Curated annotation (Swiss-Prot):
Family membership noted in the UniProt record: Belongs to the AAA ATPase family.
Entry's Gene Ontology cellular component terms: proteasome complex
BP GO annotations: modification-dependent protein catabolic process; proteasomal protein catabolic process
UniProt binding sites for ATP: G233, N234, G235, K236, T237, L238
Xref: SMART domains: AAA
Protein known as: AAA ATPase forming ring-shaped complexes
Organism whose genome encodes this protein: Corynebacterium jeikeium (strain K411)
Self-association and partners: Homohexamer. Assembles into a hexameric ring structure.
One Pfam family per UniProt: Prot_ATP_ID_OB_N
Coiled coil: 25-53
Any one GO molecular-function label of the UniProt entry: ATP hydrolysis activity
């Protein structure tokens, strides 16, 4: 009996130890499960309590006081509310959106409102802004945070009219599309056939900017504005861009490129607002000493002669706004306005008088010499030229010159084959116009592009072992295609208007005969 007990004792002890360890592991697992259940239960209880809470209201913080109260605009009225001690004092910034808990106390700061009405800044006065809505009504609001330091006149801001706060500056896409602030990459060397006109505008624009001290010595005031006018497609916009680029070589100019038709807006006063914003921006930049060029393309679309409107007659308000801004340009010093138009007779005379757009430069159609100069910018020896043609002419340079001359000869020949239209005047006389009378820089560039396309198609068709490069037949075909595509453009329903646009309206035109190519 003793032997059995002593034999079984150690074995029983080991079993008890194993069982004890197993029970301990189970107990630890039960404790872990119990803790997880308790956490889950607390989470569920928290959700139930949150569901039982009344809905929160929000308001705009007007002012935080030292006695843990705050002035809050909520539900359309101003209220003084208690601030929860859990809310950090440094977050209580006027203009911030706050959440109100049960009992109408501030329990959380949720940041700045990111929605509201859009208004235009008219004036910045300390931490207050004078703003105007889309119908022109002005009112005063407070600027939240550092907004007053960030905005300038003409900027758009998000406002809450009821609380009287402006929260954030908003970029206006339509205004940004009208303004190209970067300096264009067009130089005078890129413009051919307009040497005299380039000299005129350089004398009018660049000299006063580059040598102001000499103008002061002579008591000569620089011109406020320049009008570039003439038939379409002859380089008016290119010249304005080249002016800005030239000034950039000695200074850092600001180029505002305004597309006239895009400023038009159906809302009363909106076009005038944008004009004010543009010139305010120009004056602000000019005050730092930088030259500013405000370029109005298609000027006749905006500033037509007053009294010629058919319905709204918006010219009666838009033109005076521009006149007021032009009269204010002199005070700015470094601002000059350049306008471009192919219908200069439609622009209000008050804009064109001396003292506003002082210098008027006609950009006429190129003659044969000017056309060759323009073509030299688009067709030179750097282009692929047919090897046989290059060998026949002696060099790539000679071949390119021959191709250019071929285009000029084809366009500027005045014979029956090259007659374009016949104008019939009211006095019974008539006048024949030829291809040469309708040549423009844009047309010449398009002819070269057509010739390149034909050469590319031939190269693809002939393969690697075929001929490659520009040939005379390419440029000749391009000329015929360009003229042929234009033969349906003359407006026979209103011949006088069409002739005037294209610079041939010396007398009253009553009819047009178009001669097919």
């Amino acid at each position: 009996m003793t032997e059995n007990t002593s034999a079984e004792g150690p074995q029983t002890l080991r079993e008890l130890q194993i069982a004890n360890r197993q029970l301990g592991a189970r107990n630890a697992k039960l404790v872990e499960l119990l803790q997880a259940s308790r956490t889950k239960l607390e989470e569920i209880n928290g959700r139930l309590e949150a569901l039982a809470e009344p809905p929160s209201t929000y308001g705009t913080l007007l002012q935080a006081n030292r006695d843990f109260t705050a002035e809050v605009f909520t539900a359309g009225r101003r209220m003084r509310l208690m601030v929860s001690p859990h809310v950090p004092q440094h977050e209580l910034v006027p203009g911030a959106m706050v959440r109100l808990g049960e009992g109408q106390q501030v329990v959380e700061v949720t940041g700045q409102p990111d929605f509201g009405d859009i208004a235009q800044v008219v004036e910045v006065s300390g931490d207050r802004l004078i703003i105007a809505d889309k119908v022109g009504e002005e009112y005063v609001v407070k600027a939240a945070g550092d907004l007053a330091k960030e905005v300038v006149t003409g900027d758009s801001v998000i406002v809450d009219r009821k609380s009287g706060w402006a929260f954030e500056a908003v970029p206006r896409a339509e205004t940004n599309n009208l303004i190209l602030e970067e300096v264009p990459d067009v130089t005078y060397d890129d413009i051919g056939g307009l040497g005299q006109q380039i000299t005129q505008i350089r004398d009018a624009v660049e000299l006063p900017f580059l040598h102001p001290e000499i103008y002061t010595r002579y008591g000569l005031r620089p011109p406020k504005g320049v009008l570039l006018y003439g038939p379409p497609g002859n380089g008016k916009t290119l010249i304005a861009k080249a002016v800005a680029n030239s000034l950039a070589q000695s200074d850092s100019p600001y180029f505002l490129n305004i597309k006239g038709p895009e400023l038009l807006n159906k809302f009363v006063g909106e076009t005038e607002r944008q004009i004010r914003a543009i010139f305010e921006q120009a004056r602000r930049v000019a005050s730092s000493g930088r030259p500013v060029i405000v370029f109005f393309d298609e000027m006749e679309a905006l500033f037509r002669t007053r009294g010629t409107g058919v319905s709204s007659d918006m010219e009666s308000t838009v033109v005076p706004q521009l006149l007021a801004e032009l009269d204010g340009v002199e005070a700015a010093g470094n601002v000059i306005v350049i306008g471009a138009s192919n219908r200069e007779e439609l622009i209000d005379p008050a804009i064109l008088r001396p003292g506003r757009l002082d210098v008027k430069i006609r950009i006429a159609r190129p003659d044969a010499f000017g056309a060759a100069a323009i073509l030299s910018k688009h067709l030179d020896a750097s282009l692929p030229i047919d090897a046989d043609f290059s060998a026949a002419t002696g060099s790539n340079e000679a071949a390119a010159a021959a191709l250019r001359q071929s285009i000029v000869d084809e366009l500027f020949t005045r014979d029956e084959e090259h007659r374009y239209v016949t104008l019939h005047y009211a006095d019974g006389s008539r006048e024949d116009l030829y291809w040469a009378d309708f040549v423009s820089g844009a047309m010449l560039a398009n002819i070269v592009d057509r010739a390149k396309t034909l050469a590319i198609k031939d190269a693809l068709h002939n393969g690697a072992n075929g001929t490659d490069g520009l040939r005379p037949e390419h440029v000749n075909a391009a000329v015929l295609a360009e003229v042929g595509d234009s033969e349906d453009l003359p407006d026979t329903t209103n011949p006088a208007e069409w002739a005037r646009i294209y610079g041939h309206g010396t007398k009253r035109v009553v009819d047009i005969d178009v001669h097919k190519v």
